[in-house]
Swiss-Prot record:
Name of this chain's protein: Tubulin gamma chain
PANTHER family reported for this sequence: TUBULIN
Compartments, as annotated in UniProt: Cytoplasm, Cytoskeleton, Microtubule organizing center, Spindle pole body
Record carries keyword Transcription regulation: no
Binding residues for GTP: A135, G136, G137, T138, G139, S140, G141
Pfam family membership, one: Tubulin
Cross-referenced PROSITE patterns: TUBULIN
Species name: Encephalitozoon cuniculi (strain GB-M1) (Microsporidian parasite)
Cytoplasm listed as a keyword: yes
């Protein structure tokens, strides 16, 4: 068994996690009390994300971390109380990376002890999943500290993150979010193996377009995030012949370590109220939609110069694997995907098993995970906003009181700039020997 331990850090991370565990429970036939409701053989590996307690209740392999109780106090009872960390201060990190990181330094050993205990309960721990936002205080700051500590304590384990990026096209109530983002990106780049990127504006726009509702709520957006996370882990939880470990998925998506930013696309997305409306969709329809910018969950527009390093489509409901092969060949022949010139086209497809407890609005649904040189635009926007603040030396004092010196900002910017330039270089035929 290749187990996965999930780390939910901060308000955003715990809201993502709450919806994710609802989805996993539904797919594996487990109640939100941890009781098995579906005794059929589902062909699944429940033990990847859950363990069974002595009373046979299924308990998530998860650590919940926050500095204020509002979200974490609503966690279902089947979470182990020994795996929930809540600061005694109870006031949150005030959208300050330095505050979150400082608390992490002071209290990080308590969380590491929880992680060690969870790891010891695994037969063959493979992966840590971090769920967080990069722009606030706790998910960014405390999350950064945990990334550093996990890489020290578990250097051979995979660290994958689902990282929510800010609305870079819009003004924000959190004026220091470019600082928080760059400081977090520094730790993500140095301490993680794969960074799955979603941004708030793209999530909101896609939810609005898909559900056709006036104003999407956080519940709708978290449902979309959890749908993506469940789909991206489906071949691990319901294993087939390929891509049944995080190692195999990461080897596919991240051929070279500097290129580790992955953007998901998903179609079709519905909420429970819409699941009764059945739509017709073929394998070709779904794979074509996954290439459209509007299904992409981190907002950048592809231009001809920006190329795909690697792509993995995970499809559910496809009965004819030959249809997949024909669709891929047609896409390649028509040049519908612009791949990097320095390696053969990496257009990979995994056919997920039918999930008995999943309600789909169409026969076929699909997730695409794409590592593209377009990630440079995401990093460039954050870097540009950071430069505006840094040039004015604005708000540095509120970080300095938590021990964050100006040099740390400059180090972070340098690391982000190197990652950005690496993706620029990856567009050239001479890469990686440039």
């Amino acid at each position: 068994m290749r187990e996965v331990v999930t780390l939910q850090v901060g308000q955003c991370g715990n809201q993502m996690g709450a919806e994710f565990w609802k989805t996993l429970c539904k797919e594996h036939g487990i109640s939100m009390c941890g009781v098995l409701q579906d005794s059929r053989d589902l062909g699944d590996r429940k033990d990847v994300f859950f363990y069974q307690a002595d009373d046979n209740v299924f308990v998530p392999r998860a650590i919940l971390v926050d500095l204020e109780p509002r979200v974490i106090s609503q966690a279902p009872s089947f979470f182990s109380q020994e795996s929930i960390f809540l600061s005694n201060e109870g006031g949150g990190a005030g959208n300050n990376w330095g505050h979150g990181y400082c608390v992490g330094k002071a209290m990080g050993n308590d969380v590491i002890d929880m992680i060690q205990r969870e790891a010891e309960g695994c037969d063959a721990l493979e992966t840590f999943l971090l769920l967080h936002s990069i722009a606030g205080g706790t998910g960014s700051g405390f999350g950064s500290l945990l990334l550093e500590r996990i890489k020290e304590e578990f250097p051979k384990k995979i660290v994958q993150t689902y990282s929510i990026f800010p609305n870079n096209d819009e003004s924000s109530d959190v004026v220091v979010q470019p600082y928080n983002s760059v400081l977090t990106l520094h730790r993500l780049i140095e301490n993680s193996d794969c960074i799955v990127v979603m941004d708030n504006s793209s999530l909101g726009r896609y939810t609005l377009d898909s559900l056709r509702i006036g104003t999407p709520t956080f519940d709708h957006i978290n449902l979309l995030i959890s749908t993506v996370m469940a789909a991206s882990t489906s071949t691990i939880r319901f294993p087939g012949y390929m891509y049944c470990t995080h190692q195999s998925i990461n080897n596919c998506l991240v051929p070279l370590d500097p290129l580790k930013f992955v953007v998901p696309s998903y179609t079709p997305f519905v909420c429970d109220e819409m699941s009764r409306v059945v739509r017709k969709a073929t394998c070709s329809d779904v794979m074509r939609r996954l290439l459209l910018p509007k299904t992409r969950l981190a907002g950048y527009e592809q231009t001809k110069a920006q190329s795909v390093v690697s792509m993995l489509n995970i499809l559910h409901g496809v009965e004819d694997s030959g249809e997949v092969s024909r669709t891929v060949m047609r896409f390649l022949d028509k040049g519908m995907v612009n791949f990097v010139p320095w390696m053969p086209p990496s257009f990979n497809v995994a056919l997920g098993k039918c999930i008995a407890n999943e309600t789909r609005p169409s026969r076929v649904s699909g997730l695409s995970l794409t590592n593209s040189t377009g990630a440079s635009l995401i990093l460039s926007k954050i870097s540009g906003q950071f430069d505006k603040l840094r040039k004015q030396r604005a708000f540095l004092d509120i970080y300095k009181r938590f021990g964050v010196e100006p040099e740390m900002f400059d180090e972070g910017k340098e690391i982000v700039q190197k990652a950005l330039e690496e993706y620029h270089s990856a567009e050239m035929a001479a890469y990686p020997n440039h």
